[in-house]
A protein has these predicted regions:
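Bacterial N-terminal signal peptides that target proteins for export
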Residues: 1-9
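Extracytoplasmic soluble-region selector
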Residues: 26, 100-103, 227-263
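Bacterial N-terminal signal peptides
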Residues: 9-19
């Protein structure tokens, strides 16, 4: 009987361990930027560059300016999600990686806690061109599922301002609060690196529900360029006998030198 109880206890501990979410070991120390074209499989994308977080964090001598920003979200059921984060703008990362932002069609984010495919995909317009905002006056009632203005008025846009999409090196997040209240106590002392790299991008409107898209543990970005590589040859008119051998030299012109070499 004692052996049976011991085995049951061990089994319960094992099950509990398997049920734990991914946390500390999912934190990413480096991030890759990979490039390719629409229709390519994930393994066909070319790794343009890979950076450790120290190479990017200006607090540790890194190359990118980091910023402290607030971000607001709602989940579509009356719950709000607030973030205070320090990190670098995605636009700056792509520029530093040598990616032509104007040629991008879409951007995919891969995370360590999501094993199959991209965790979240955006068109270039949705992530980088569409204005996105922080709404400090946004509050919600989880019981009714309704959103309301924290200041008691009827304008959810009070105090709103535009924000840039970011990959956070450290952050503090909280559910079921409003930005005006959150800002009164959220500070650097609450920062944690436990979700690095953490994607934040704000809201296009107060009602936009996108809490699940604030991806944690990002380790790879797939950049898809619009169009296709252009292939050309100096030989335009070939007069050959059927079955004869002839080497045709083709030149590839892609959106990036790394892709030109690959194609």
């Amino acid at each position: 009987m004692k052996k049976l109880l011991t085995r049951l206890a061990l089994l319960m501990i094992l099950c509990a361990a398997l049920a734990l979410p991914v946390f500390a070991d999912a934190v990413t120390d480096s991030i890759s930027v990979c490039i390719g074209y629409f229709g390519w499989s994930e393994d066909e994308y070319v790794e343009k560059t890979k950076f450790s977080w120290q190479e990017l964090d200006d607090w540790y001598g890194g190359a990118l300016d980091t910023h402290e920003e607030y971000y607001s979200y709602c989940n579509g059921s009356g719950r709000t999600y607030l973030a205070f984060a320090r990190g670098f703008y995605i636009r700056d990362l792509l520029d530093y990686a040598g990616v032509d932002v104007n040629s991008i069609a879409s951007i995919d984010f891969f995370t360590k806690d999501h094993s199959v495919g991209a965790y979240r995909s955006f068109t270039k317009y949705a992530l980088l061109d569409q204005p996105r905002y922080y709404f400090p006056n946004l509050a919600g009632d989880a019981e009714t599922g309704e959103l309301y203005a924290w200041d008691g008025g009827d304008d959810l846009w009070v105090g709103a301002y535009q924000v840039e999409p970011m990959l956070a090196l450290e952050d503090y997040t909280e559910w079921d609060t409003a930005g005006f209240d959150f800002e009164s106590y959220a500070d650097e002392s609450l920062f944690s690196t436990g979700s690095r790299f953490h994607l934040f991008f704000g809201q296009a409107s107060p009602e936009e529900a996108a809490t699940s898209s604030a991806a944690k543990y990002v380790y790879k970005i797939l950049v898809t360029f619009s169009g296709t590589p252009a292939l050309s040859s100096e030989e335009s008119n070939l007069d050959l006998v059927v079955g004869s051998d002839h080497a045709l030299h083709v030149t590839a012109d892609a959106e990036d030198d790394a892709l030109t070499a690959y194609v």
